[in-house]
Amino acid sequence: MARVAVLGGTFDPIHLGHLAAAQGVLHLTGVERVIFLPNRQPPHKQGQPVTPAEHRAAMVRLAIADNPAFGFSDLELRRPGPSYTIETVRALAAEHPDWEPAFIIGLDSLLAIRTWREWETLMQSVDFFAVTRPGHDLAAARRLLAELGPRLSGRVRLLEIPGVAVASADLRRLAAAGYPLRYLVPDPVARYIAEHRLYLRGESHGDG
């Protein structure tokens, strides 16, 4: 079985913070690869506009192309409807029976995990790496793990990983204002955004 970590996200756009988190997980956990898995429609963002999947997938592929330890999966992009993690876990097991996956999530996602679909089944099925930057208060996360008990909390590992304090929503606002994204996203991604005029005010990139 290949031990892999799965980093799901909207990646709208992918940025250096995502890549730093993935590299940190590689270094700290001993997984063989990190698989980037863009989602079609995150359940917590239903109704919000999302850049078409082909653009987001292209940006992820460009961002990870120079790292052989990074891989790409379009599994969620091939499935209609919201991307629920429990369904992804089952689909990955069917599509990649040789993988032993763990999921990379942010600390905010860990704190909200009891709102996820079939969350107890999910936590019994896979391990989680909950990542945060050094210096963040972990008290709330530790309280949650204590409440979950050893059976479920044993599936979670808290990881402090140095990274870039940037959010995709902020990058979209910066791009809309004409601010250069160089040094915030990989250079090939910055060029792709510019070439395809993504995130500019008044530009439409919707699927319809």
Swiss-Prot record:
Pathway: Cofactor biosynthesis; NAD(+) biosynthesis; deamido-NAD(+) from nicotinate D-ribonucleotide: step 1/1. It catalyses: nicotinate beta-D-ribonucleotide + ATP + H(+) = deamido-NAD(+) + diphosphate. GO terms for biological process: NAD biosynthetic process. One of its GO terms (molecular function) is ATP binding. Its EC number is 2.7.7.18. Keywords: ATP-binding, NAD, Nucleotide-binding, Nucleotidyltransferase, Pyridine nucleotide biosynthesis, Transferase. It holds the Pfam family CTP_transf_like. The keyword Cytoplasm does not apply. InterPro entries: Cyt_trans-like, NadD/NMNAT, Rossmann-like_a/b/a_fold. It is an enzyme of class 2 (transferase). Catalyzes the reversible adenylation of nicotinate mononucleotide (NaMN) to nicotinic acid adenine dinucleotide (NaAD). HAMAP family: NaMN_adenylyltr (MF_00244). Belongs to the NadD family. This is Probable nicotinate-nucleotide adenylyltransferase. It comes from Symbiobacterium thermophilum (strain DSM 24528 / JCM 14929 / IAM 14863 / T). The gene is nadD.
